[in-house]
Design a protein with these regions (language model features):
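Conserved short alpha-helical segments that host acidic/polar catalytic motifs at enzyme active sites
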Residues: 1-128
């Protein structure tokens, strides 16, 4: 987290995380480490949430975001948990605890998302 702050996390969160990942990759390469980085990360400023999924090698930890709240309520009207979510809520998790079809959308490896007031935008994530 502190390293990402050093690389501009507050000004441009995705770019700051990409620069941080690039720095770790370059240090790893210099030390002869073949796959130095595996990460799923989420940060927020209280209004936006940025999350990224990345690994140096082929094995990448998982990361998911939820469908919109209205869809969740329609899919699972008996699930009381969804009644407590605000209309613009989204949930981001490393691994879903429950297998609810239609709820979880996997974020691809090498991607980041920006969640703003219930919308989810996906962008490429590539170390710089």
């Amino acid at each position: 987290f502190h390293l990402a702050l050093t690389f501009g996390l507050e000004d441009d969160p995705v770019a700051g995380l990409e620069r941080m990942a690039g720095f770790v990759e370059s240090l790893g390469a210099a030390a002869g480490i073949v796959e130095p980085l595996q990460m799923t990360v989420g940060v927020t400023d209280g209004e936006h949430l940025w999350a990224a999924r990345y690994a140096s090698g082929p094995v990448v930890n998982t990361l998911y975001h939820s469908a919109d709240v209205e869809s969740l309520r329609q899919l699972y009207p008996e699930n009381e948990r969804f009644a407590h979510f605000g209309a613009d809520s989204r949930v981001v998790v490393s691994e879903p605890l429950t297998p609810l079809p239609g709820v979880w959308h996997e974020i691809p490896a090498g991607a980041a998302i920006v969640v703003t007031k219930g919308t989810v935008d996906q962008v490429p994530f590539s170390p710089r």
